[in-house]
Design a protein with these regions (language model features):
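Bacterial N-terminal signal peptides
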Residues: 5-14
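N-terminal signal peptide c-region/cleavage motif recognized by signal peptidases
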Residues: 16-18
Length: 265
């Protein structure tokens, strides 16, 4: 009996960091599964902000739980747990930011001031500091060099139609690789944001703004063109088109970004 109690305690000690990291996101998982809907044959999603607003206390409790994670605890996690945590934090606080003015808002950009954007607003209590959304994305995720994964651009969501879809579930450590791959393909499949016409490849402006992130050797890709070819199937590229892109023989143009709110009508 005593041995069993000790064994259970030891198992709990070994499992607690993982179980805490995963159970932490359960409220966010429930909110997303209820209030985010696929559109455009699944290539995008829209968000029922009115329903989110009705459950804002649940969202706030989740954000408070994220805020209790210390830098020491975070640093002890493997990087896939860290990255899932940071993506969820970014997306959840973005929804909270929208709810501060919804329904009297048509775009997240309306929440900025004349000399500052909504992404520079410091309202996020995370890892012992008050941060902005920019800080989460560009410092904690992109700036450390720890993750070096350009697919995060298809996971963090800026509450706009032009953004990659807000995933209908929380990011988790054990599913992160699968989720990032699926989100990348999902975005590239959306012909309203990425397509070929008249021997020109038209891409979302995301690829222009963060071009350098796609040149850092992810899966052997040292250029945007090489990254695109990795996901040739999602773009429905034939062999000739793939070769033209590899050889820089195809023009690439970047589409205007749609900043309208990704709200469910």
């Amino acid at each position: 009996m005593k041995f069993s109690a000790i064994f259970i305690t030891l198992v709990g000690l070994f499992l607690s960091p993982t179980s805490h990291a995963e159970s932490l996101h359960s409220p966010w998982q429930q909110l997303l599964s209820k209030h985010v809907y696929p559109i455009n044959q699944g290539s995008g999603t829209e968000v029922d902000y009115q329903a989110f607003k009705a459950q804002r206390n649940t969202l706030k409790n989740y954000l408070e739980a994220l805020s209790t994670v210390s830098q020491t605890e975070f640093d002890a996690w493997p990087k896939h747990k860290q990255l899932a945590f940071l993506i969820n934090a970014y997306n959840a606080w973005t929804v909270e930011l929208i709810l501060t003015e919804y329904p009297n808002i048509d775009s997240i950009k309306e929440l900025g001031r004349f000399f500052s954007s909504p992404w520079s607003k410091k309202f996020v209590s995370l890892l012992g500091e008050t941060r902005s959304l920019d800080n989460i994305e560009h410092t904690l995720i992109r700036g450390t060099g720890r993750y070096n994964d350009p697919r995060i651009h298809f996971a963090v969501n800026c509450a706009s139609i032009g953004c990659p879809a807000l995933l209908e579930e929380a990011y988790t450590a054990d599913k992160l690789e699968q989720q990032l791959t699926a989100q990348t393909k999902r975005f590239l499949t959306d012909t309203s944001r990425n397509y070929i016409a008249d021997d020109t490849l038209y891409l979302s402006s995301i690829f222009k703004w963060y071009k350098s992130d796609f040149e850092q050797g992810f899966k052997g890709a040292n250029s945007l063109n090489e990254f695109i070819v990795i996901y040739a199937d999602a773009l429905n590229l034939n062999q000739n088109q793939q070769q033209a892109i590899k050889n820089n023989d195809m023009d690439i143009e970047f589409l205007d970004y749609n900043w309208a709110l990704n709200a469910k009508n």
